[in-house]
Amino acid sequence: MEKDDPPQLVTPTSVKAIILRIEAAQLTRAQEDISTQLSDILDNVNCVINRFQEELGYDLKENAKSQQRDPKGKKRFILLEKIASFSKDAMMKEKHLYDILRWLGDWGDTLTYEIGPRKSEEEAAALDEWIEVTEKVLPLSLIATKRGIESLTALCSTLIEGQKKRSQVSKRTFWQGWQGRSPQTSPSHPQPLSPEQMLQDQHTMNTKASEVTSMLQELLDSTMFSKGEVRAIRYMATVVENLNKALILQHKENRSLETKYRHLQMQATKELSSQRLHFQQFMEVLESRRDALLKQVEILGGRYHDLLLMKQALEFQLKKAQNATGQAEDLAEVSVDSPGPSERETLPRKETVMEESQQEPMKEEQLFSPLPPSPMAMIRDSGAIAAGHQPLSTMTVRSRVADVFGSKDTESLEPVLLPLVDRRFPKKWERPVAESLGHKDKDQEDYFQKGGLQIKFHCSKQLSLESSRQVTSESQEEPWEEEFGREMRRQLWLEEEEMWQQRQKKWALLEQEHQEKLRQWNLEDLAREQQRRWVQLEKEQESPRREPEQLGEDVERRIFTPTSRWRDLEKAELSLVPAPSRTQSAHQSRRPHLPMSPSTQQPALGKQRPMSSVEFTYRPRTRRVPTKPKKSASFPVTGTSIRRLTWPSLQISPANIKKKVYHMDMEAQRKNLQLLSEESELRLPHYLRSKALELTTTTMELGALRLQYLCHKYIFYRRLQSLRQEAINHVQIMKETEASYKAQNLYIFLENIDRLQSLRLQAWTDKQKGLEEKHRECLSSMVTMFPKLQLEWNVHLNIPEVTSPKPKKCKLPAASPRHIRPSGPTYKQPFLSRHRACVPLQMARQQGKQMEAVWKTEVASSSYAIEKKTPASLPRDQLRGHPDIPRLLTLDV
């Protein structure tokens, strides 16, 4: 087959004209682009030169003139750059022209194919029409292409110009002022301040912070950073400013703490100095007392020595008399059993000597005893002892004391007790002690002189037994007055010692309160740490399960808690339970007490009744309605009678308290509160109104606290049960993966959970019981107080109703009306039927059973006891003032 010659490409004149126009347009466009770029570069260079001239303060053109050492090299470099740019542009233009030529060749092929031999006139007409359309559309498409190319070139030129500007902008030297302030001799930069220097010197820290902020502001003022970088620099500047402010606040707080510390130190030093001075004075007093006692012991020793000498002399005289008469044996027997009339002269002598020898240790015992025996007590003791069989010496001494107090001279001893009432502490410690010592010495000298006279008098044989008794009674009168004087001084010393003991007890109580607070804070930290661990455990358990082996290791490492740790937690939980202590008793005077009924405020006259379960044991701090200070009910107020102020004591047995349970809905409490808040309409005294208002507000707050405790208890219970269920699931997974040996730790963990649950739930139960007791006492106080207000002051307040914890089955309506009693003392509901009145009791019992069922359910089952629904026809005030949904909200709040 003969090969056909390829068709020759024939370019029409119109196409050639279009190509020429395109080339001319491209040349003009390239020239314009080059001129615009050169002008932009020149403008940018001028702008940079002007900016640096403004900032640096000198002209760059002068430096350029001085630095024009090699202008030819610079011109050559610029020329080479221009030639390279022109060559790049020429290559790009050649490439573009080649693409256009190829595109035009394709168009020529299509046009030659279309211009081929025409078959018919219709095809020729269609072809002509297509050519006309192409002639119209082609310039438009070329124009659109030109515009697109122009927009692309403009966009690329802006990007290229920005890049060129960034590359052409010379690197700016920042922080010249900071560098100028730094010493030029040191090669390194200035070192920043250490944290200790910042805390010590506030002025230096402020200057350094201002320097850093000014440096960051200089960065912000420059235009060489992008928006993101500027935002980051601004963030750093704000952080530095905030740190500076925080340090300033810390400085202020440190100064305030230093001033407080100095003030407390001064107070402590003053207190210690005063205590030291007081202790020194007290020691001086004790030393003076010791010296006085030592002196008294010396005097008594000398007297005892004299008495021994007198005893020997008397024995010698007695032996001499016995030898003279020759009847020594008979006289000895008679003197032991019953003295005869011949020996009555010698016996009083021995009796007086023995009496005085025994009175001295008795006086010593009285001096060192805390409270001396009264004269009447000594008379009774002397009478009782003299009646029995005792030795001769003791009988004689007691009989003489009885004779002394039985005589008429005892009337002179009774007024001595009167000055004991005036017990005031002396301002100076030395004067009373010196006076007391002087009086002691004088009294002892008088007493010893009189004792010596008495002994000499009894040694003589001229007086009878009656005269000797009279002399001894007169000589004993003044020592008793001395004893009373000493007793007065001893009472003063005892009172001073009691005062110091009270102060020491007070300091011990304050120290114990501080220790209790520290222990409570430690327990709170421990509870927070345990709660944080529980939250971390829950988060870890919510994460996707890992492989069995890794899961067992994680359980051993995270879930397992040693038994010792749980024992510590048990102790902490037991310590968190409120128990009566000395700190609580000390704080009871400062805590606001709940109002109590008049029966609890007034004790009985005989025996004080024991504390019942209704009385408060622990009184939490509660919010109250602001009222004026109350007046005591025991003091009469002007304008009121005493009969209205004194309330009769209400004696309630524990059996009656257990049987009666009072209830009052929130609507009635709100009505009472509204009625009591209206002062103008009520004519109650202020103390009665404040007491009733306090009872009402306390009852409402206790209801809210009961609901809060119940919700907290239930939340804690559900959390522990969910944690327990998760542990059980882990145990099952380990059993399935045949890793049961690793489940032992989880079993220990489950035991610890059960132990902790029992402890915490018991603590919450105790709190709930305490609130219930307070609530019952408030309601019983209302039942006691409100009817009396209604009777005496005509104030009609809603009274709590009496409900039975174990109500009997409701009888039919045909029952006799005598079995139906009113629910309150003065509150009656005659419009309700008997059957309908028994329904709330059944509902209350059913709701209590349902709550017990809720607490006894397991998490896995989540089933509740099925009970009979509450009929919808009952009003809400019969259902304790609230609907039956949800079951948890069974409290009247």
Curated annotation (Swiss-Prot):
Biased composition (Basic and acidic residues): 342-353
Keywords carried by this UniProt record: Coiled coil
Protein's UniProt keywords contain DNA damage: no
Gene: FAM186B
InterPro entries, per the entry: FAM186A_B_C (IPR049146), FAM186A_B_N (IPR049144)
Name this polypeptide is given: Protein FAM186B
Biased composition (Polar residues): 179-188, 197-207
Any coiled-coil regions, as ranges: 303-331
Region span, Disordered: 177-207, 327-376, 537-557, 574-611, 806-827
Domain of life, per lineage: Eukaryota
GO annotations of cellular component type: protein-containing complex
